[in-house]
Amino acid sequence: MTDTPDPAAVLSPAVKAAVLSEALPYIRRFHGKTIVVKYGGNAMTEERLQRSFAHDVVLLKLVGLNPVVVHGGGPQIDDALRRIGKQGTFVQGMRVTDAETMEVVEWVLGGQVQQDIVMMINEVGGKAVGLTGKDGMLIQATKKLMVNKDDPSQPLDIGLVGDITRVEPAVVKALQDDQFIPVISPIGYGEDGTAYNINADVVAGKMAEVLGAEKLLMMTNTPGVLDKGGKLLRSLSAQTIDELFADGTISGGMLPKISSSLDAAKNGVNSVHIVDGRVPHCLLLEILTDQGVGTMISSH
């Protein structure tokens, strides 16, 4: 089966010039600003979308923005677990993580997945550097305490899943100042050195807050947030989100994504979007054009 051509490759010179002209005011507006991108879903597994993502990130850096990538890797973790005869289990969108699973998470995310992303960005002209929470004490964490959403009196033990207690941004800012693109694996570490698996959406949201990011973009395998009828919701307020949580419209893996997005919006991130990672060049479309490709989250 042949690869689907990149849409950008078949544009006429006139159309490309028009696109660049449209991007100019956005480049001016966001020059020097930090953009945090949660990279996950199909965009991580389909070759043409991988290329599109890498080119977008490098272009954003070259025109003066400061992209920071926080990546997931759920399918890769599931594959690795299957190879050792384990089945992944989730509770309220969080992966149950015993000690053996945590070992797999560390070498899959901090090794295989992270290095693949770093290499991919570097191959198209960027300078990416991989980080985990241990590097520069970037992500400090403690064991996550959860309760049954249907019965808050019942605690849930989901193993070595972490809550972020502190983000130390110095190492990220130093890399940005030297024109590197940080690629962050969502692994935190406790005071005693215990490694914790942290949901990548949560890490991306907290990183955007601490870095004072202009934008947070969460890449997904859907057009954005959908209502019960499958219709795209182009914008969500805090009140609407509460209603969608209550009636079950937002559930599973979308729960931490929306919660983290709303927290980021409430804590100073100017623009938060859930974007369709299946759309080639979705980052450029969302950041540098008038055409949005997802759902905007507002704290109001």
Swiss-Prot record:
State which Enzyme Commission number(s) the record gives.
Answer: 2.7.2.8
- Catalysed reactions, as listed in the record: N-acetyl-L-glutamate + ATP = N-acetyl-L-glutamyl 5-phosphate + ADP
Key word Kinase present in the record?
Answer: yes
SUPFAM superfamilies annotated for this entry?
Carbamate kinase-like (SSF53633)
Q: Which domain of life is it from?
A: Bacteria
Q: Name the InterPro entries for this protein.
A: AceGlu_kinase-like_sf (IPR036393), AcgluKinase_fam (IPR004662), ArgB (IPR037528), Asp/Glu/Uridylate_kinase (IPR001048), Glu/AcGlu_kinase (IPR001057), NAGK-C (IPR041727)
Localization, per the record, is: Cytoplasm
Its Gene Ontology biological processes?
arginine biosynthetic process via ornithine; L-arginine biosynthetic process
Give the record's pathway.
Amino-acid biosynthesis; L-arginine biosynthesis; N(2)-acetyl-L-ornithine from L-glutamate: step 2/4
What GO annotations for molecular function exist for this entry? Answer: acetylglutamate kinase activity; ATP binding
Residues involved in substrate binding: 73-74, 95, 197
Quick check: keyword Transferase in the entry?
yes
Keywords for the protein's UniProt record, in alphabetical order: Amino-acid biosynthesis, Arginine biosynthesis, ATP-binding, Cytoplasm, Kinase, Nucleotide-binding, Transferase
Q: Where is this site: Transition state stabilizer?
A: 38, 257
Q: Which GO terms describe its cellular component?
A: cytoplasm
Record family assignment: Belongs to the acetylglutamate kinase family. ArgB subfamily.
Functionally, this protein is described as follows: Catalyzes the ATP-dependent phosphorylation of N-acetyl-L-glutamate.
**Database matches in NCBIfam families:** argB
Q: What is this protein called?
A: Acetylglutamate kinase
- Taxonomic path: Bacteria, Pseudomonadati, Pseudomonadota, Betaproteobacteria, Burkholderiales
Underlying gene: argB
